[in-house]
Curated annotation (Swiss-Prot):
NCBIfam families: dapA. The active site is at 132 (proton donor/acceptor), 160 (schiff-base intermediate with substrate). Keywords: Amino-acid biosynthesis, Cytoplasm, Diaminopimelate biosynthesis, Lyase, Lysine biosynthesis, Schiff base. One of its GO terms (molecular function) is 4-hydroxy-tetrahydrodipicolinate synthase activity. It catalyses: L-aspartate 4-semialdehyde + pyruvate = (2S,4S)-4-hydroxy-2,3,4,5-tetrahydrodipicolinate + H2O + H(+). This is 4-hydroxy-tetrahydrodipicolinate synthase. Pyruvate binds at residues 44, 202. Gene3D superfamilies: Aldolase class I. The gene is dapA. Pathway: Amino-acid biosynthesis; L-lysine biosynthesis via DAP pathway; (S)-tetrahydrodipicolinate from L-aspartate: step 3/4. Homotetramer; dimer of dimers. HAMAP family: DapA. One of its GO terms (biological process) is lysine biosynthetic process via diaminopimelate. It comes from Geobacter metallireducens (strain ATCC 53774 / DSM 7210 / GS-15).
Length: 290
């Protein structure tokens, strides 16, 4: 259902407020460069520091600007099941094509708790739902066997797998077959994960290099494995640079250096340190981004 290069778009700020004009410009930058779908209010979109009204206004703005040209998948995850249901229902009402649901963070549910959490959301809201496993940020790893229990639900269509583990992604693919799509959640293994059967990537790097990430996934689907492999290797250095500090600090800093939007982030995130900013700028110059 969702495939190819899917950008986890940043939420631009200006003096503490969401910069909706810049958000619309970023959407156009993505679509004009071949991005296949857009995820507002994910990790990269700083969803955890948006209030409810801001969250929904960002989702609505992206949906309006996209105007059905590509799918919009709203980040609606929460560590409160009730809140995740509320956000998902609202996203459906405003026209989202799907929702992305991060595993509950901080409260560390058991695997049974994860099954009940996602089943409750899928039963309550009839919209395509993407599970999102990112244990490095949440403190809980959703095991392949747990994904297999959820995969048959008609509203659960995919998982964003961001453990960085090809083994775990492969186990999900082996256990679930065609019951659920797998999307790569780590830019540095997009090509190898697609070779295992993933349908695409939910990408941080696509914020600054949308054309290149789209070319990689397009090449894979066209059967041009050599081109996809070369793009995979060529983008490793810049992709790794997106994580020299906590995401989305580097990618917002990069967008700032490119003049696309302010590099402003919300506390407790803070501006990138001078040494890392210098390092990032040097790498961006190598890629002729600035």
């Amino acid at each position: 259902m969702f495939k190819g290069s899917i950008v986890a778009i940043v939420t631009p700020f200006n003096n503490g407020q969401v910069d909706f004009e810049k958000l619309r410009e970023l959407v156009e930058f993505q679509i004009s460069n071949g991005t296949d779908a857009i995820v507002p209010c994910g990790t990269t979109g700083e969803a955890s520091t948006l209030d409810y009204d801001e969250h929904m206004d960002v989702v609505k703005t992206v949906i309006e600007q996209v105007n059905k040209r590509v799918p919009v998948i709203a980040g609606t995850g929460s560590n409160s099941t009730a809140e995740a249901i509320e956000l998902s229902q609202k996203a459906k009402e405003v026209g989202a094509d799907g929702v992305l649901l991060v595993t509950p963070y901080y409260n560390k549910p058991t695997q049974e708790g994860l099954v009940r959490h996602y089943t409750a959301i899928a039963d309550a809201v009839a919209i395509p739902q993407i599970l999102y496993n990112v244990p490095g940020r949440t403190g809980v790893n959703m095991l392949p066997e747990t994904v297999a229990r959820l995969a048959p639900h008609k509203n659960i269509v995919a998982i964003k797998e961001a453990t960085g583990s090809l083994q775990q992604a492969s186990e999900i693919l082996a256990l679930c077959g065609d019951k659920i799509d797998v999307l790569c959640g780590d830019d540095f293994i997009t090509f190898p994960m697609m070779a295992c059967g993933a349908k695409g990537v939910i990408s941080v790097l696509a914020n600054i290099m949308p054309k290149t990430v789209a070319e990689l996934t397009d090449a894979f689907y066209a059967g041009d494995m050599e081109k996809a492999r070369q793009l995979h290797l060529q983008t490793l250095k810049i992709g790794n640079a997106m994580f020299i500090e906590s995401n989305p600090i580097p990618v917002k800093t990069a967008l700032g250096l490119m003049g696309k939007c302010s590099d402003e982030v919300r506390l407790p995130l803070c501006p990138m340190g001078a040494a890392n900013k210098e390092k990032l700028a040097a790498i961006m110059k190598e890629y002729e981004l600035i």
